[in-house]
């Protein structure tokens, strides 16, 4: 195990256990001698073997540097060069399991865990989308969990800035996921049908697939090929109109769908049985053919399925667009990516080109403050625990009173964003007149441990039996 590691890495870390090894790398559970923390140490083999892999490595590091301070995004602690100048080491925060392995274990997750996981995923994706960035590779193995059921989103190798995608000349097809070995089971119809342009809806589709997989215990659309994947989707979701098909901007969509063999349909509500009505409704509203008709992440956060965990003060957004420091709409040389990454290692930080929005994002962020500092959340999971404790005592019939129409969800999303305001001193106040300082004091109360105990599923997850996947 240790023979594959450079000497200078051994000097920094005690390798405790190999968590996994694949064609592209190896991951250890390691002890950081300097910080005295347990980390996940990932060695990427031949990170700069070709321009495609070089660009993916570069993207992952750059986007993690920008988004890693969100409580639901995996933190990249450090980056280390390898002696051979081909490999690279990444030190991440350690997480006990990933959602893929948890689902494989069977009936580990209860309904409340699934709701809590989805709410945290929506928070993470809202943060990315507010910076105009798509993750593009959302799947259960990229959703990491700890014993407290806290979620961390990982693997940003396919993430792209929407602004950089818009730099493509009119009529030129944007790069799709076929350049990488990406899991097709979670791809949206517009990607499968080679759309000329795609939107934040690609991530929302993937989130719908993840939720469905948690509900039924297996992948919803396990296609064996691109065509088979499209067939499985079209035999399940609501039939799109001609306008819906035209809206994705694919030259092939109409002809492919017309030639598709007709098989008996099996709607989602017949596949996802023994689940809450709100859960089925959310899946149906996410798995819609036309991207513009899918729920947005803001609407998801106020949907009845997860609204019990919704707290606007715990859902930060960015007030600028995120660009990687190298052009992302063209592929550069291996040396370009490697040299820039090494410069960043030497500088201990990455520079992002930031374009300030004319209109400040919700919650009245102060432009004079550092953007990442604005985005930090303190004691996020404590407030979530409080929310859970309150909602578990509520009448179960309350959820039926929610109007699940898209219009109502939009109104709730807008209402939630207006719940906070600033006082005369510039300090944020919520709808009850509380300031962050007063809330923070309450968070430090002796009730903290008791509240966390109400959601801590460590006795259920048995994280030591699960395999992490970074």
Curated annotation (Swiss-Prot):
Sites where Phosphotyrosine occurs are at 180
GO terms in the biological process aspect are: cell projection organization; dopamine uptake; intracellular signal transduction; protein localization to ciliary transition zone; regulation of cilium assembly
A Pfam family: Pkinase
- Using the UniProt annotation, give all residue ranges assigned to the region (Disordered): 362-445
Keyword list, A-Z: ATP-binding, Behavior, Cell junction, Cell membrane, Cell projection, Cilium biogenesis/degradation, Cytoplasm, Cytoskeleton, Kinase, Membrane, Nucleotide-binding, Phosphoprotein, Serine/threonine-protein kinase, Transferase
Catalytic positions are 137 (proton acceptor)
User: What residue intervals hold the motif TXY?
Assistant: 178-180
Q: Which Gene3D superfamilies match?
A: Phosphorylase Kinase, domain 1, Transferase(Phosphotransferase) domain 1
**Domain named Protein kinase: which ranges?**
13-306
Effect of gene knockout: Viable, but males display irregular mating behavior. Ciliary defects in ciliated sensory neurons include impaired extension of dendrites, and abnormal amphid and phasmid sensillum morphology. Homozygotes present the swimming-induced paralysis (Swip) phenotype.
UniProt record similarity statement: Belongs to the protein kinase superfamily. CMGC Ser/Thr protein kinase family. MAP kinase subfamily.
Name of the protein described by the UniProt record? Mitogen-activated protein kinase 15
> Origin organism of this chain?
Caenorhabditis elegans
Q: Source taxonomy lineage?
A: Eukaryota, Metazoa, Ecdysozoa, Nematoda, Chromadorea
Gene field: mapk-15
